[in-house]
Amino acid sequence: MRGGVAPERALPIAAEETRDPGALEVAARVAAGAPIAEAIAAQGKPEWRVLAAAWGLAERSGAPLAQALAGIAAALRELTRLRQQRTVLLSGPRATVRMVATLPPLALVLGGLLGFDPLPVLLSSVGAALLCAGAVLLGAGVGWARSLARSVESDDRIAGLEFELAWIALRGGAAPAEALVRVADCVDEFGAEWVGFDCFRAGAPLRTALATALRVGVPVGPLLLEEAEAVRARARAELESEAERLGVRVLVPLGVCVLPSFIALGVLPVLLSMLGGL
């Protein structure tokens, strides 16, 4: 589009180049006559709806579409970086859970190798009770630990998008108050849930940044982009802190459930086998 290609033509070209299934579906809808922003929003995923809101906002406000999409694309790439960073940060707690979960069966194997066969004990009524209790505790502990990890994974969003969208509206020549209205309308129309409506209330960071720029007399656009990057930097720092806290919290299910399971499945059967052989 920066080279002068019309959006209706640029979209299928980009879809063919990338061979992305989502982009191909959007191009097919546009070819069937759907408006581009609506075709993008029909993909249903949050990142597509954000892109649809940015596209529709640029079209309606008269902002340069190529620049608007470049800014949103840079913001959306942050999602990939966050997912990669989160995978790395959570690898430690996940490895801890997997390692500790293997201890009970390993203890049984080790006891057998040492000559204390725990199988007769496990086949007795006492052993059956130990097996049931240990299995329940082990399953509960692993499930609990995994749920803690999923709670960190569930916050899958990009922060600061309201600043990017407001910048697009302002690039179209709208006054700050009108720009906020246009952004809110597009967010509502295309269902961009990563941009909450509380972002537009009085005292919110977006309104504070606009008021500061107008009061001091600095250019609004660069200030909004700087604020967007600052918000995303804080989100990255929060992700790191949350992953560090997870490394501590995951010790609770390991201590409350997995350790007793290790005793029930790995220690007591071997100990009873030893005592029975005396």
Language model features: what each stretch is:
Residues 1-93, 152, 157-252:
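Catalytic metal-binding core of the metallo-beta-lactamase
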Residues 85-142, 240-278:
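Bilayer-spanning, highly hydrophobic alpha-helical transmembrane segments
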Residues 148:
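Residue-level signature of catalytic and energy-coupling elements of molecular machines
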